[in-house]
């Protein structure tokens, strides 16, 4: 279904609606005071049925409390809309999903056809003058990568709009239970004023009102509403602290004053962590921390980790509260790692050594000299802890960097080795760069413009499949490390696969796949151990499905592409091409496997 999203209009409407609820909230509070005034008359109001009447107005005040809970929940929901939009990275956006679903892909295809045609013409011209001057044919690598990136942005935008729409709609619909709760509660109150023949506040039975089973169910729903409001409050606080963390992250390290770091630390870690990092007191053990330890804790809080307390607090995950009618299911945790986005941590590493360097410097100072950054003596235990902390933080490369810059006189060999290695690597890289194009062409060959189109389309479809799998509810373990796609160039059909978590090949095997698994050379099968089982990987599952659909297919007509289904390591984030394992190389041999390094040409 086509959707139109405009962030500015939605946010403005939410603000307008919020003001209306705030006006209603003021009126309800006035009404509650009036009801409570009658209920609190005490001995000033006596006589036949007076106590029942006062109890009745106390019940009315309770009904108003239910209205106030409903209003507060609606205000909390409306307050969170702008944050929900930001979580999906749709700030200042206007999106028509029909355009992204249809017009834009058609435009991409047309653009690819035009670019390929132009390249063919230029290649023809360069070939015509090759006897005069030898020029390398240019490739479409950069174009393919940029088009792939653009398609990913398109898909991510559609997914973001769908997620936001579903999230807000579901959350709002769940709040309707509070509407029903108020009306039901009022109905039970009215029932409690009846004597069987007529209804009057004089006949009000407070015990009957509170013991009614329907009343008890309503109270449970209202408690969920209160929990929802608390969750939204925590959500708003988490978002505020994340913004503050990013603001702090963008400051140069030398602008992060001790007081500023203390205040920042106190806000992001909660009361206990505040006591530890800013006052130097552990509220659990009562131990007093040194000034150096407090500075270290403050710096590491700004950088994303508090060494005194570790990863502390409760985590607010997913950027939204989960509210379900009938169960008190609110997922709203509050933690430091929620406030530290990847971008924040990257910035917080700063220039040179930055905040991490402050801690490393103090740690090495304690280990080498037996004194902290302020010259105070530390115990043997603290010296060992300081060394371990510093080494853990900056790692082997950071260790060399630290000694190079701070202990050059005492560690000349480290500096010499580092410089010689650097010069060697630069020379090696220069030599490789001069022959890389020819090397890749010799190794991988070149692609026709038809295969270029196939590759772009296959890449897009595999990333679409990855997006679908991520939103399907499968855990990271269930979806495994890879998603593979196979394009049958003859039929234009796509087939997909993920790893079998039990390490088993497909239950129904194409004869070719079966033979290759069974007849795999022993040294190959036993020589590769980083697998749960030969034939269980994503590309084998996808290829097997394609062959089952067209058993007599020529393997050269089957194009295979594999990407990471999650972040494997720093060099292999989610969604990047993956190499095949030795088992899969053997099983999928002779297919049209597309490595990312492949160069295109005539």
Swiss-Prot record:
Keywords for the protein's UniProt record, in alphabetical order: Coiled coil, Secreted
Entry's induction text: Expressed on rich and minimal solid media likely in early stationary phase; dependent on DegSU. Not expressed in liquid LB, but only under conditions that promote biofilm formation.
Origin superkingdom: Bacteria
Cell compartments where the protein resides: Secreted
LXG domain span: 1-235
GO cellular component: extracellular region
Keyword Cell membrane: no
Null mutant phenotype: Deletion of the ywqH-ywqI-ywqJ-ywqK-nfi operon has no visible growth phenotype, however it is out-competed by wild-type cells.
Coiled-coil residue windows: 6-41, 227-251
Pfam families given in the database record: LXG, PT-TG, YwqJ-deaminase
Role of this protein: Toxic component of one of 6 LXG toxin-immunity modules in this strain. They promote kin selection, mediate competition in biofilms, and drive spatial segregation of different strains, indicating that LXG toxins may help avoid warfare between strains in biofilms. Mediates intercellular competition during biofilm formation; disruption of the operon disadvantages the bacteria, but overexpression of the cognate immunity protein restores growth in competition with wild-type. Overexpression alone in situ causes growth arrest but not cell lysis; no effect is seen on DNA or rRNA.
Subunit structure of this chain's protein: Probably interacts with cognate immunity protein YwqK but not with non-cognate immunity proteins. The interaction inhibits the toxic activity of YwqJ.
Family: In the N-terminal section; belongs to the LXG family.
Protein name in UniProt: Toxin YwqJ
Name of the gene this protein is made from: ywqJ
């Amino acid at each position: 279904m086509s959707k139109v999203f405009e962030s500015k209009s939605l946010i403005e409407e939410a603000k307008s609606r919020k003001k209306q609820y705030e006006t209603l909230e003021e009126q309800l509070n006035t009404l509650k005071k009036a009801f409570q005034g009658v209920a609190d008359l005490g001995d000033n109001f006596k006589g036949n049925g007076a106590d029942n009447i006062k109890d009745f107005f106390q019940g009315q005040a309770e009904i108003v409390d239910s209205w106030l809970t409903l209003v507060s929940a609606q205000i909390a929901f409306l307050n969170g809309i702008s944050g929900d939009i930001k979580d999906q990275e749709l700030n200042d956006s206007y999106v028509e999903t029909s355009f992204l679903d249809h017009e834009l892909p058609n435009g991409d295809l047309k653009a690819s056809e035009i670019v390929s045609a132009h390249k063919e013409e230029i290649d023809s011209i360069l070939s015509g003058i090759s006897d005069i001057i030898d020029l390398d044919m240019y490739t479409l690598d950069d174009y393919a990568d940029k088009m792939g990136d653009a398609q990913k942005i398109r898909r991510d935008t559609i997914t973001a709009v769908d997620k936001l729409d579903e999230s807000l709609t579901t959350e709002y619909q769940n709040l309707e239970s509070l509407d029903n709760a108020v009306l039901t509660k009022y109905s039970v109150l009215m029932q409690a004023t009846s004597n069987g023949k007529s209804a009057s506040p004089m006949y009000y039975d407070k015990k009957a009102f509170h013991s009614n089973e329907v009343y008890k169910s309503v109270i449970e729903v209202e408690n969920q509403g209160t929990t929802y409001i608390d969750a939204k409050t925590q959500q708003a606080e988490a978002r505020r602290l994340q913004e503050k963390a990013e603001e702090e992250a963008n400051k140069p390290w030398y602008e992060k004053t001790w007081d500023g770091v203390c205040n920042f630390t106190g806000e992001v870690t909660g009361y206990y962590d505040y006591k530890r990092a800013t006052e130097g007191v552990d509220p659990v053990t009562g131990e007093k921390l040194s000034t150096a330890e407090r500075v270290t804790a403050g710096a590491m809080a700004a950088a994303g980790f508090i060494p005194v307390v570790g990863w502390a607090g409760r985590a607010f995950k997913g950027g939204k509260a989960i509210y379900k009618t009938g169960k008190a299911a609110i997922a709203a945790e509050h933690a430091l790692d929620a406030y530290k986005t990847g971008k924040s941590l990257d910035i917080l590493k700063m220039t040179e050594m930055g905040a991490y360097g402050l801690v490393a410097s103090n740690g090495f100072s304690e280990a080498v000299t037996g004194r902290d950054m302020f010259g105070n003596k530390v115990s043997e235990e603290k010296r060992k802890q300081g060394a371990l902390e510093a080494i853990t933080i900056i790692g082997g490369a950071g260790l060399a960097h630290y000694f190079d810059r701070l202990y050059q006189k005492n560690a000349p060999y480290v500096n010499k080795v580092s410089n010689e290695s650097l010069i060697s690597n630069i020379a090696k890289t220069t030599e490789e760069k001069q022959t890389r194009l020819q090397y890749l062409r010799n190794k991988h060959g070149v692609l026709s413009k038809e295969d270029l189109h196939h590759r772009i389309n296959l890449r897009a479809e595999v990333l679409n499949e990855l997006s679908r799998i991520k939103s399907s509810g499968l855990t990271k373990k269930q979806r495994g490390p890879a998603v593979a796609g196979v394009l049958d160039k003859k039929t234009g059909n796509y087939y997909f696969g993920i790893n079998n978590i039990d390490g088993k090949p497909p239950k129904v095997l194409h004869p070719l796949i079966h033979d290759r698994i069974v007849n795999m050379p022993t040294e190959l099968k036993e020589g590769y151990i980083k697998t749960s089982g030969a034939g269980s990987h994503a590309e084998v599952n996808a290829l097997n499905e394609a062959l089952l659909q067209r058993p007599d297919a020529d393997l050269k007509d089957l194009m295979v592409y594999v990407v990471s289904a999650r972040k494997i390591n720093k060099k292999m984030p989610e969604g990047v091409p993956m190499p095949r394992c030795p088992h899969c190389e053997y099983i999928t041999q002779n297919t049209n496997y597309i490595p990312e390094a492949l160069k295109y040409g005539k």
